[in-house]
Curated annotation (Swiss-Prot):
UniProt keyword annotation of Protease present: no
Keyword Transport: yes
Function: GTPase-activating protein for ARF1 and, to a lesser extent, ARF5. Directly and specifically regulates the adapter protein 3 (AP-3)-dependent trafficking of proteins in the endosomal-lysosomal system.
Protein name: Arf-GAP with GTPase, ANK repeat and PH domain-containing protein 1
Modified residues (Phosphoserine): 521, 605, 663
Span of domain GLD: 67-241
Domain remarks: The PH domain mediates AP-3 binding.
């Protein structure tokens, strides 16, 4: 390394240390300012948020992720008109957002290349590439808009800037032309020949044309760039020769890639990226090549530019787990069953425990009210009062975790082998030939062939007393080390030694060394802000001398696959073991139900194709519901109508409360959604939404996007063309009950379009208590049940006898209604349905206008 390179590295290291050390003084200043807040409730709430921010900063990936977790660093550059922010947003969330982010952003996502999981770091640069950016990236994506000449020329400029800082032959490059802004008003100006020439000028890089509006080639771009990085690393590794550890090349050891059904990863904005947090909508086009983990990736403190936008675009991928805004949670999740609050799952175990904060340099403990539910989620709140009020709560999804007790073998674990530890593998044996994991079923067997009937085995590993590290303290020897419990549910096969590739996740490698008394914190003033647990049971030399002294801690640790740890402590030995056993049972139950939970009611490929064709064959579905474009391939679920791709983009912008958009070709279609679409169709939908168009001209195929958007907003948002309500003395809610009882779909759709949430939830009467959802489920009508749920009916409502709609669905033996109700959080209570009188009318004539209220007979 030459002298200039050494100076550059030294300067970069000093700058990073200065940045890192500047965070805590600012946080401590906030703690001091909090003392001036007179309102105690507000003060505590702000303090909890600051603590959470501090925890997230301290537990960033550089301190928590195992060295065996490989990273791929992708930089994205382009000017404000290039469409790069929409490209990134579509890849992360599956949705389209037109707004461009001037400051760029930092995002994380898991991506799978050749069966190997990688942490993909995406850096959306807010300006031209600088030296720090150029030296950081493993690959670069240059983005321009096909309708903007300036963005096209900017790529040449940015490429020249990159070449000044780094040899571009060292890194893969990808060129992307975006089609998002192309319209009749903005025609395409960059033809294919010019784009191909640019790709040749950029050292013959791969060229893609993408459309973030409907996802064309978006996944393919990122998958391709990831594969190029991996291939480049392998080529470099071969040219260097066999090497166990290469700087900045963490792909030398594999990670246990658990093939679990899709779980959410948090793409967090590191350093003020524009995706600041995520709501609850599910992406419409999920990737089959990427797995998403249900974990929050902590942000770092770098800021791309000093100028921040006042309003950040919010992604549709995530929901905050803090529970600090119950109204938003209720609105966003529609009272799902596993939420915390009224109607949530009943805890199978609960009580007060001590929890250690996530700080690595001190042992600070606080009392938490902890609950464990049978849905595989452990929650903790600062107090019982907060739990009852559903505020300040945090969740731990136990699906990808393990639980361990320092110095004690978990009671459910069985010894399968006695591996020889190594400092590089944190106590895991390199000779694992006695362990076999079948390639398909996920079963784990030991040398003796012991195997659980469920296909999941618990295997413990004893580690030898070699030198190991924990919490930055070095220990040379110890009498016994703790055993890590491994719960294997991935499709991995190995009949030979697995070496470093054996599940090198923190759930295995995180062993616990003897307790040490930490050195005094350099920030002593912080102790007055947070309660610190007594460490009087430790010896002066920092080591607990006997097993009895270790046992007095009554501590257990939950470790996630990504390295997050949660330390809890009970008051007695029995209480701790009870918690550990209950948590292990829920981990096992979550793994066993993992496969079955994703196997919802799905049609086979052939029957699904026939079902989708039946949707296209509905009257009016050969043309777009709003502009008459032929052969529409996009659907609005709650409207029951088909539309063209341009109108679907406008419908997305209306919001899911008005239109739930889904692709016929790209998305999954459960049975209940197919039935909704097969029951309505464009002709029926327009008979409701366009009956009173009053001679206004409907947009045509050649109409501009602006004309189509004006029509669509007037039609669905302002409801200017909506058919009038039927003439009747009944209230809208009572009329909806009658239409549901009669299974009159058109009338029900019309009433739902006119009605409010309160009217949709109107009941048959004080002595009855049934809502329209009860009546729909009693009839086994999944179409009406699904529509009512989308329009805001309370799925947890009970009739006068305490029966939910689920009880009526079970009585009607309607599995489709049962599945829909459970999906939206209806309490799963198997009570015997108490008889409730039928809802009928005294006059069977549907056109009866006597206005008689539905009668209970």
């Amino acid at each position: 390394m030459n002298y200039q390179q050494q100076l550059a590295n030294s300067a970069a290291i000093r700058a990073e240390i200065q940045r890192f050390e500047s965070v805590h003084p600012n946080i401590y200043s906030i703690y001091e300012l909090l003392e001036r807040v007179e309102e105690p409730v507000l003060q505590n709430q702000i303090r909890e948020h600051v603590i959470a921010i501090e925890d997230a900063f301290v537990n960033s990936q550089e301190w928590t992720l195992s060295r065996s977790v490989p990273e791929l660093k992708v930089g994205i550059v382009g000017n404000l008109a290039s469409g790069k922010s929409a490209l990134v947003h579509r890849y992360l969330t599956g949705t389209y957002v037109q707004e461009e982010s001037p400051e760029g952003g930092r995002f994380k996502k898991e991506i799978v290349v050749d069966g190997q999981s990688y942490l993909l770091l995406i850096r959306d640069e807010g300006g031209p590439p600088e030296a720090q950016f150029a030296m950081w990236v493993d690959a670069v994506i240059f983005v321009f808009s096909l309708e903007d000449e300036i963005s096209f020329q900017t790529v040449y400029h940015y490429y020249s800037r990159m070449a000044n800082y780094r040899n571009t032959s060292e890194i893969p490059l990808v060129l992307v032309g975006t089609q998002d802004a192309i319209s009749s008003a903005n025609p395409r100006v960059i033809d294919d020949a010019r784009a191909r020439k640019l790709s040749n000028d950029l050292k013959r890089c791969t060229y893609y044309e993408t459309c973030a509006t409907y996802g064309l080639n978006v996944e393919r771009v990122f998958q391709d760039v990831a594969q190029k990085i991996v291939a480049t690393r392998k080529k470099q590794q071969l040219s260097i020769g066999p090497c166990k550890s290469l700087p900045n090349s963490p792909s030398h050891s594999s990670v246990c890639s658990a093939q679990v059904s899709a779980v959410h990863i948090s793409q967090t904005s590191n350093g003020g990226g524009s995706l600041s947090d995520y709501s609850s909508s599910v992406p419409s086009t999920p990737s089959t090549s990427q797995k998403e983990l249900r974990i929050d990736v902590p942000p770092t403190a770098n800021t791309p530019t000093p100028v921040r936008k006042q309003s950040k675009r919010r992604s549709n991928l995530f929901t905050s787990r803090k529970g600090s805004d119950p109204d938003k949670e209720k609105k966003g999740l529609e009272s799902r069953a596993d939420s915390i609050g009224s109607g949530r799952a009943i805890p199978i175990k609960q009580g007060m425990l001590l929890k250690r904060s996530g700080k690595s340099l001190n042992k600070e403990w606080k009392k938490k009210y902890v609950t464990l539910c049978d849905n595989g989620v452990l929650t903790y709140h600062p107090s019982l009062h907060d739990y009852m009020q559903n505020v300040h709560g945090k969740e731990i999804d136990l699906l990808r975790t393990t639980v361990k007790v320092p110095g004690k073998r978990p009671p459910r674990a069985t010894s399968a082998c006695a591996p020889i530890s190594s400092p590089k593998t944190n106590g895991l044996s390199k000779d694992m030939s006695s362990l076999h994991i079948s390639p398909n079923s996920g079963n784990v067997t030991s040398a003796s062939g012991s195997q659980m009937a469920s296909g999941i085995s618990l295997v413990s590993f004893n580690s030898r007393p070699d030198g190991m590290h924990q919490r930055s303290y070095s220990v040379s020897s110890a009498d016994q080390w703790s055993e890590a419990t491994v719960i294997a549910n991935s499709a991995i096969s190995s009949d030979t030694g697995l070496g470093d590739s054996v599940c090198s996740s923190p759930s295995i490698s995180s062993t616990t060394s003897p307790k040490l008394d930490p050195p005094p914190s350099p920030h002593a003033n912080r102790k007055k802000h947070r309660r610190k647990k007594s460490t009087s049971n430790f010896k002066a030399d920092g080591l607990s001398g006997t097993a009895e002294e270790q046992e007095e801690n009554f501590e257990f640790i939950i470790v996630s696959l990504t390295g997050q740890t949660w330390h809890f402590e009970a008051t007695t030995y029995e209480e701790r073991d009870a918690w550990v056993q209950a948590i292990e049972s829920q981990i096992l139950a979550s793994l066993q139900s993992c496969e079955s939970s994703k196997n919802k009611s799905r049609l086979t490929s052939q029957s699904e194709a026939m079902a989708l064709q039946s949707i296209r064959n509905m009257r009016g579905n050969s043309h777009c519901v709003d502009c008459e474009t032929q052969n529409p391939n996009w659907a609005s679920l709650n409207l029951g109508a088909l539309m063209c791709i341009e109108c679907s983009g406008i419908h997305r912008n209306l919001g899911t409360h008005l239109s739930r958009v889904r692709s016929l070709d790209l998305d999954d279609w459960p049975v209940e959604l197919i039935k909704v679409m097969s029951s309505i169709g464009n002709e029926l939908a327009n008979s409701v939404w366009e009956e009173s168009s009053q001679g206004r001209t409907k947009p045509s195929v050649d109409s501009t996007r602006e004309e189509k958007e004006r029509w669509i907003r007037a039609k669905y948002e302002q409801k200017l063309f909506l058919a009038p309500l039927p003439c009747t003395e009944l209230s809208l809610g009572q009329h909806l009950l009658r239409a549901t009882a009669d299974e009159d779909l058109r009338t029900a759709i019309l009433l739902l379009a006119h009605g409010s949430r309160d009217e949709v939830n109107e009941t048959c009467g004080e002595g009855d208590g049934r809502t329209a959802l009860h009546l729909a489920c009693r009839k086994g009508n999944v179409v009406l049940a699904q529509l009512l749920i989308w329009y805001g009916v309370d799925v947890t409502a009970r009739d006068a006898h305490g029966n939910t709609a689920l009880a009526y669905a079970r009585q009607a033996s309607s599995q489709e209604c049962i599945d829909v109700l459970l999906q939206y959080g209806c309490p799963d209570e198997r009570f015997v349905l108490m008889a409730t009188p039928n809802l009928s009318r005294r006059n069977n004539n549907r056109n009866n206008s006597s206005g008689r209220v539905p009668t209970i007979i």
